[in-house]
Amino acid sequence: YEEEGFEVEFTNGGGADNTMAAVLSGSADVGFCGPEAALYIAIGGSSDSPKVFGQLTKRDGSFLVARTPEPDFKWSDLGGKEILAGRKGGVPAMTFEYVIEELGVNASLNYDVDFNYMTAAFESGIADYCTMFEPTASDYEAEGKGYIVASVGEQSGEIPYTCFAAKESYINENPEKIEGLLRAVTKATKFVME
């Protein structure tokens, strides 16, 4: 990022809704999250809505975590079970919905718990399964709090999962920064892949 002239401060927004709130308020120039939040804001009629200008990932990175080891897990095992799936309308929850609908699984998806509190809710006894990202999923398994039984992304296939978005005015006023950020991300991705 320094090669492109950036002094970057990364902050965990705690979900696409909070990330877009930071972009809209001006406390963040660029948000990195699922593309759905930018769409919801545009549909809402914002005069300076965020626009997606780059995509980083193309697959859901979450894992399905069970309370007990299930070495022979099948998606059909979720029938009649409760799953903490994320915020309703968020890409993680929509991807999970897609997976179980495609497989014809009738499960109860719990959308009542904020993304930042899903793992704590699961640990406290809410739901039979929970979707978790790394490193949390592996940490839970290492601590005996839960067991990874499936990869949501492996089952869902490719989707535009995470992207970069900024207010339209910021993009129009800072095209060199937008292009520089994308170059920096491309360089970083190539570095990681080598």
Where are these regions (language model features)?
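Short, glycine-/small- and polar/acidic-enriched structural segments
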Residues: 2-105, 109-112, 121, 128-135, ...
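Pocket-lining segment of extracytoplasmic ligand-binding domains
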Residues: 114-194
